[in-house]
Amino acid sequence: MMERYLIKVLGRVQGVGFRYFAQSLAGTYSITGTVKNCEDATVRIEAQGEEKNLNKFLAEIRKGNRFVKVEDIVAKKIPTADNEKSFKIVY
């Protein structure tokens, strides 16, 4: 079943390639949506896909990588977006 989440990511997530990291993971797990840096030093993600793929995506986001250090993730379900085809970085 298709789900969509609004996700706020806190930690060392700006200036470290996090948005590209998220975009790459989204491609791996067939996730559509957007990722954007926020003025409060967090990153906002809207992610849509099959629930099992979203769970894998979130688990990988939580792990981060050698540059990214995620301290917390806040996720809530939001209505799905029809006809969304890709995962984009928003500037």
Curated annotation (Swiss-Prot):
Keywords: Hydrolase. Residues 4-91 form the Acylphosphatase-like domain. Disulfide bonds: none annotated. It is an enzyme of class 3 (hydrolase). GO terms for molecular function: acylphosphatase activity. The keyword Iron does not apply. Its EC number is 3.6.1.7. It comes from the Bacteria. Pfam families: Acylphosphatase. The active site is at R19, N37. It catalyses: an acyl phosphate + H2O = a carboxylate + phosphate + H(+). Belongs to the acylphosphatase family. PANTHER family: ACYLPHOSPHATASE (PTHR47268:SF4). This is Acylphosphatase. It comes from Clostridium acetobutylicum (strain ATCC 824 / DSM 792 / JCM 1419 / IAM 19013 / LMG 5710 / NBRC 13948 / NRRL B-527 / VKM B-1787 / 2291 / W).
